[in-house]
UniProtKB/Swiss-Prot annotation:
One of its GO terms (biological process) is defense response. This is a cyclic peptide. Pfam families: Cyclotide. Keywords: Disulfide bond, Plant defense. This is Cyclotide mobo-A. Belongs to the cyclotide family. Moebius subfamily. There is a cross-link at residues 1-29 (Cyclopeptide (Gly-Asn)). The presence of a 'disulfide through disulfide knot' structurally defines this protein as a knottin. InterPro entries: Cyclotide (IPR005535), Cyclotide_moebius_CS (IPR012324), Cyclotide_sf (IPR036146).
Length: 29
C-alpha cells in the first residue's frame, strides 16, 4: 500500500518485483 516502488503504471503494469498497480503509481504493502 505504500508508494515505495518509484514506478508508475499508467499502462496498468508494474515491472518492480513485489509491486502492484494502484493507478497511476506502483505500490508495495
Amino acid at each position: 500500500g505504500f508508494p515505495t516502488c518509484g514506478e508508475t503504471c499508467t499502462l496498468g503494469t508494474c515491472n518492480t518485483p513485489g509491486c502492484t498497480c494502484s493507478w497511476p503509481i506502483c505500490t508495495r504493502n
